[in-house]
Amino acid sequence: MRRLVWDASFRRAFKQRTRRQPSLQELILDVLKTLAENPFEPSLKTHKLHGQLEGLWACWVEYDCRIVFAFEPDPAGGDDLIVLADIGSHSEVY
């Protein structure tokens, strides 16, 4: 299982998103658990980003909610860390 690292920008966007849509909080936390267990689980629709966001990845929470993240080497060894960068609608994060 990979370790999730919540970047400050992700933490802020998560709070804003769940304040606007409280029902999303549990769904997002479930997706984060799945992401830590298997980032390429088909239900997440994980994909590489291109252009200005090259080097980052995104996964699907629901129709108009995406999580943007990066794989970083774990200084302690083992599986890569997943650094959570942003969460929001398609137009907000891309």
Identify the meaning behind each predicted range.
Residues 11, 15, 54, 89-92:
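A broad detector of the eukaryotic-type serine/threonine protein kinase catalytic domain
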Residues 16-20, 38, 59:
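Histidine kinase transmitter module recognition
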Residues 31, 45, 55, 63-65, ...:
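A generic structural signal for short beta-strands and their flanking turns/coil linkers
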Residues 34-58:
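A short, surface-exposed loop/turn module that caps and links secondary-structure elements
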Residues 1-31:
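Arg/Lys-rich, positively charged N-terminal/basic patches that mediate binding to nucleic acids
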Residues 3, 22-25, 60-94:
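Enriched for short, Lys/Arg-rich terminal
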Residues 17, 35, 71-72:
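Hydrophobic helix-cap positions at the C-terminus of alpha-helices
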